[in-house]
């Protein structure tokens, strides 16, 4: 294992950072792709990465969309873990700034990998957005059980879109479809595995201040524990970030079926009820509740979604961490930073 080299993109993000830590802790050497040099200092300063500095090198690629951006970056690698993907921003040109980049970066790295004979597997971070159309999300149906085989190919990439999250879902589904098309048409020598997480929850070690803990999907948990009263339902499915990272690195193992896809979500088909976070924190962090650090005045309606990820648990041989573990991970990190402030 110590002789194997991985190239990992997106290491400055919530999932990508944990994938980096998981890979290093298992003895992989890692070539981590970042967009600016300052990101490497922040990553190297974390307690989880410090013990493994001799195993990691950072490579700056300012624009992953440039043709040939990965030229030379993948040389000598045994595997690639592609996590980087654009997130919704303030732009309303969703095709230009969200959908096209998601597709083009993925195809860019697949083309580069095809030129490197040593690469055996490419692992790509997809999303349950590759399963769920916006029309389904806003429907009243909560009976359909989705498996990893229920992906769809979006036919409308131009819009209009209902909102940024509608466009984000299309971007992930389009990137997934482009990956499948690449495998079919190019027939690369390496195998490709897509990992499809639901709402990713768990400590993000790159957040160093309490006000940063609420960034991204962890903000759903923190909003409930503090005082954010949302009226808009959020998909009631979640997964621990550590499990998502574990799945990415496990997927490199040749005993795991290649050219296959794996759904990552906890709680079985019943999924997650976001407001349960209050009872979890009352039970596990009663002093923080009594001290007013967690007023528990928030509210987050859950949109029931039924996902069956049992095939992933069977393939990898472990169970997804509970919603309780996810909540504790976020709450304890917020508490730690609040006390240290």
Show the residue positions of the predicted features.
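NAD(P)H-binding glycine-rich loop region in Rossmannoid oxidoreductase-like domains
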Residues: 38-44, 48-104
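Conserved C-terminal active-site "lid" loop/helix of NAD(P)H-dependent oxidoreductases
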Residues: 298-319
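Active-site Tyr-X1-5-Lys
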Residues: 154-192
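N-terminal Rossmann NAD(P)H-binding glycine-rich loop of SDR-like oxidoreductase domains
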Residues: 3-33
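A conserved pocket-lining segment of Rossmann-fold NAD(P)-dependent short-chain dehydrogenase/reductase
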Residues: 157-163, 207-239
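Glycine/proline-rich active-site loop of Rossmann-fold NAD(P)-dependent oxidoreductases
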Residues: 186-189, 202-218, 251-262
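Mid/C-terminal beta-alpha module of Rossmann-like enzyme folds, strongest
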Residues: 235, 245-298, 323, 331, ...
């Amino acid at each position: 294992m110590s002789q194997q080299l991985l190239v990992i993109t997106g290491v400055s993000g919530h999932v990508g950072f944990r994938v980096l830590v998981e890979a290093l802790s298992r003895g992989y050497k890692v070539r981590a792709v970042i967009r600016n040099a300052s990101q490497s200092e922040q990553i190297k300063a974390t307690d989880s990465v410090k013990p493994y500095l001799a195993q990691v090198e950072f490579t700056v690629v300012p624009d992953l969309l440039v043709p040939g951006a990965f030229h030379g970056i993948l040389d000598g690698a045994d595997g690639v873990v592609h996590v980087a993907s654009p997130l919704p921003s303030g732009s309303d040109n969703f095709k230009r700034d969200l959908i096209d980049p998601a597709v083009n970066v993925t195809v860019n790295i697949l083309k580069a990998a095809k030129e490197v004979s040593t690469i055996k597997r490419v692992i790509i971070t997809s999303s349950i957005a590759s399963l769920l159309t916006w029309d389904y999300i806003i429907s009243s149906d909560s009976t359909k059980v989705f498996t990893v085989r229920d992906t769809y190919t979006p036919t409308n990439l131009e819009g209009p879109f209902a909102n940024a999250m509608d466009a984000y879902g299309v971007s992930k589904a389009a990137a997934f479809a482009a990956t499948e098309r690449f495998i079919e048409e190019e027939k690369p020598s390496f195998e490709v595995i897509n990992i499809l997480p639901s709402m990713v929850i768990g400590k993000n070690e790159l957040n160093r201040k309490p006000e940063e803990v609420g960034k991204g999907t962890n903000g759903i948990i923190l909003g409930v524990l503090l005082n954010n009263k949302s009226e808009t339902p959020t998909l009631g499915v979640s997964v621990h970030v550590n499990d998502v990272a574990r799945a990415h690195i496990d997927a490199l193992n040749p005993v795991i079926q290649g050219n296959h896809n794996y759904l990552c979500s906890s709680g079985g088909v019943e999924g997650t009820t976001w407001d349960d976070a209050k009872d979890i924190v009352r039970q596990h962090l009663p002093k923080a509740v009594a001290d007013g650090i967690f007023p528990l005045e928030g509210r987050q309606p859950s949109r029931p979604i039924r996902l069956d990820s049992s095939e992933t648990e069977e393939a990898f041989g472990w169970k997804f961490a509970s919603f309780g573990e996810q909540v504790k991970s976020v709450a304890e990190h917020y508490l730690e930073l609040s006390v240290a402030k």
